[in-house]
């Protein structure tokens, strides 16, 4: 039987780490070669793309932008910049109209400098920031540029001090940091109340399924076989090069292929629409193999 290859999109439930979801999928699919595209904090729900088999090699080529729907709690500051952490300050929030609150969001639209939360997966001298934070260390995490492509105010509840936002942003953006920084800008502090990811790496909620239960762990009907999303469907933003049978043989042996159009990463397909890998087009009218699924000596 051919090894599985493709993507499955999980609607991650609250309370599980992204790694726990990957571990579950390894048991369900009975393969170790499983990886995820974009870590979600345990409390966060929503779209978690899972790559299976050689599709794990395609993760760097997927579009990195993500979309979230979140609720920010003003007036509360915590050690983790969300309600999962220890409350360190409580203040009154300002009496703002919907229009004034929307204007307050303007400095956070576009490309901004953002400091990651103290409790985050950012590497600091080879160690995750959250590991050092658990030891009580306060880390100086430098700001880094992120892009918030759109920031929409969905609802502002003054009585509760809660605002609901939809955020479309670049990879590496922390919505917890956005909540913290907005609270600081308003002079009242703030943290993330809840968060759901609605789009990641080109996959949306409509692609997502509930996290499957391993057959040995369920008491109900047997698990339906999972249908993996073909890898080329996740790479629609890239150009395509279809190979002839002769070119396919050359490709499998790692030889360059004549290629006249475009440059950069290119999806390589067979004549029967099977993905063969990723090539890098160059200015010399060549397509150089970068990821080859059917490699031969």
Swiss-Prot record:
Recorded E.C. number(s)?
Answer: 5.4.99.25
Which Gene3D superfamilies does this chain map to? Pseudouridine synthase (3.30.2350.10)
Keywords from the UniProt entry: Isomerase, tRNA processing
Which residues are the active-site ones?
41 (nucleophile)
Matching entries from InterPro entries are given as:
PsdUridine_synth_cat_dom_sf, PsdUridine_synth_N, tRNA_psdUridine_synth_TruB, TruB_C
* Sections of the chain in a coiled coil: none
Catalytic reactions of this protein: uridine(55) in tRNA = pseudouridine(55) in tRNA
Could you give a single Gene Ontology term from the biological process aspect?
mRNA pseudouridine synthesis
Keyword Chloroplast assigned to the entry: answer is no
Molecular function (Gene Ontology), one example: RNA binding
What is a single Pfam family found in this protein's UniProt entry?
TruB_C_2
Similarity comment = Belongs to the pseudouridine synthase TruB family. Type 1 subfamily.
Q: What does this protein do?
A: Responsible for synthesis of pseudouridine from uracil-55 in the psi GC loop of transfer RNAs.
Q: What is this protein called?
A: tRNA pseudouridine synthase B
Q: Which organism is it from?
A: Synechococcus sp. (strain CC9311)
Corresponding gene?
truB
């Amino acid at each position: 039987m051919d090894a599985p290859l493709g993507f499955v999109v999980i609607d991650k439930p609250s309370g599980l780490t992204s790694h726990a979801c990957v571990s579950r999928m390894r048991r369900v699919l009975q393969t170790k070669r499983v990886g995820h595209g974009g870590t979600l904090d345990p409390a966060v729900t929503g779209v978690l793309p899972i790559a299976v088999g050689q599709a794990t090699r395609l993760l760097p080529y997927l579009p990195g932008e993500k979309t979230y729907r979140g609720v920010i709690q003003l007036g509360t500051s915590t050690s983790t910049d969300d309600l999962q952490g220890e409350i360190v300050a409580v203040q009154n929030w300002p009496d703002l109209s919907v229009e004034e609150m929307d204007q307050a969001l303007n400095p956070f639209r576009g490309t901004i400098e953002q400091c990651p939360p103290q409790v985050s997966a950012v590497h600091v001298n080879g160690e995750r920031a959250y590991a050092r934070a658990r030891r009580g260390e306060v880390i100086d995490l430098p700001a880094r540029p992120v892009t918030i492509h759109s920031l929409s105010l969905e609802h502002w509840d003054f009585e509760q001090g809660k605002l609901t936002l939809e955020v479309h942003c670049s990879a590496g953006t922390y919505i917890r940091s956005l909540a913290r920084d907005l609270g600081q800008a308003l002079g009242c502090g703030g943290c993330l109340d809840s968060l759901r990811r609605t789009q990641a790496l080109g996959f949306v909620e409509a692609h997502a399924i509930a996290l499957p239960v391993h057959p040995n762990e369920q008491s109900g009907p047997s698990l339906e076989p999972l249908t993996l999303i073909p890898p080329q469907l996740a790479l629609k933003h890239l150009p395509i090069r279809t190979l002839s049978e002769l070119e396919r043989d050359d490709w499998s042996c790692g030889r360059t292929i004549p290629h006249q159009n475009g440059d950069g990463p290119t999806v390589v397909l067979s004549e029967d629409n099977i993905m063969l890998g990723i090539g890098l087009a160059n200015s010399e009218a060549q397509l150089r193999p970068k990821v080859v699924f059917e490699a031969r000596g």
